[in-house]
Amino acid sequence: MATIKDVAKLASVSTTTVSHVINKTRFVAEATQKRVWEAVEELNYAPSAVARSLKCNTTRTIGMLVTQSFNPFFAEMMHGVENYCYKQGYTLFMCNTEGDLDKQKHYLRMLAEKRVDGLLVMCSDLNEQLLAQLEKNTELPMVIMDWGPDSPHTDKIIDNSEEGGYLATKHLIENGHTKIGCVTGQLDKATCKERIHGFYRALSEANLTSNPDWIFEGDFECSSASKSVEKMLQMEDKPTALFCFNDIMALAAISKIQQTGLRVPEDISIIGYDNIELSAYFSPPLTTIHQPKRRVGKTAVEILLERIKDKHHERRIFEMHPEVVTRKSVHKL
């Protein structure tokens, strides 16, 4: 099995230079990098992660707990995380918890055993029990992303869901809608509480009220939006516009409405939330609330790497500011 000395000899460089090239820890001339990587490939060299971690007290790995990796919103944010980790020479261990407490505990224990250098947490389902377990790991640098609970011991990214809910509802009101319903996520989740608070704030500012029958509790999945729309269409007094708390529910709502022969936006207007890539290509293209997902992913890693370098760094809070992306799914009355 090839060693770092073999690579250095073949590339005509020092072992220190080989280490810097492989770990991306210092600038090395492009021509030198090319020789090193050619030697690595020719010798099929794989550095020992165990030896490196013992020598440097670092594994160059980051763990990530995420609720649902298959949801487009999470997938796009994770792309930003993974891409920036790779550029910085870190390997990402992504753990899809699916909201299961036992899986969350198992993955957290596994990541601790792997001696990851830091942890990103993007779980809406963090309960007090798991949060307490996270806070026991005071030596582990950690960034709470998106919907996670607040903690004085971790850096945090805030998505300003209340502001987003307000902007979405205000946009519908500005287009003449006074009969507005919404398809929410689980109402016990912090992000849903914030978005519906923004929804009611916009209505209140316009001296409007919402029929409680027009508030449909979903779960951020397509099937819940489809069932909600089915209930809505059976009502005699229907809203003229729906605010869906994420884009995939909005797209499901549009599909269900169109299957009944009604038109979006001529008969019912729809606004979504997240601005996933697919939303621009649906029919009609979806008006939605934009969140800079890939940039947030990159920022989360930047904050975490700062924390890894300096565990006593002042706590950082990064705020996202949502904005309306106007397309074709909202009709002006």
Curated annotation (Swiss-Prot):
Alphabetical UniProt keywords: DNA-binding, Purine biosynthesis, Repressor, Transcription, Transcription regulation
Keyword Transcription regulation: yes
Positions contributing to hypoxanthine binding: F73, K189, T191, F220, D274
InterPro entries: HTH_LacI, LacI/GalR-like_sensor, Lambda_DNA-bd_dom_sf, Peripla_BP_I, Tscrpt_reg_HTH_PurR
Pfam families documented for this protein: LacI (PF00356), Peripla_BP_3 (PF13377)
Keyword Transport among UniProt keywords: no
PROSITE patterns: HTH_LACI_1, HTH_LACI_2
Pathway it works in: Purine metabolism; purine nucleotide biosynthesis [regulation]
Residue ranges of every copy of the HTH lacI-type domain listed in the record: 2-56
GO molecular function, one term: transcription cis-regulatory region binding
Residues annotated to bind DNA: 4-23, 48-56
SMART domains registered for this protein in UniProt: HTH_LACI
Gene Ontology BP terms: negative regulation of DNA-templated transcription; purine nucleotide biosynthetic process
Subunit and partners: Homodimer.
Domain notes: Consists of two structural and functional domains: an N-terminal DNA-binding domain, approximately the first 60 residues, and a larger C-terminal domain, approximately 280 residues, which imparts the function of corepressor binding and oligomerization.
Function: Is the main repressor of the genes involved in the de novo synthesis of purine nucleotides, regulating purB, purC, purEK, purF, purHD, purL, purMN and guaBA expression. PurR is allosterically activated to bind its cognate DNA by binding the purine corepressors, hypoxanthine or guanine, thereby effecting transcription repression.
Name by which UniProt lists this protein: HTH-type transcriptional repressor PurR
Gene it is expressed from: purR
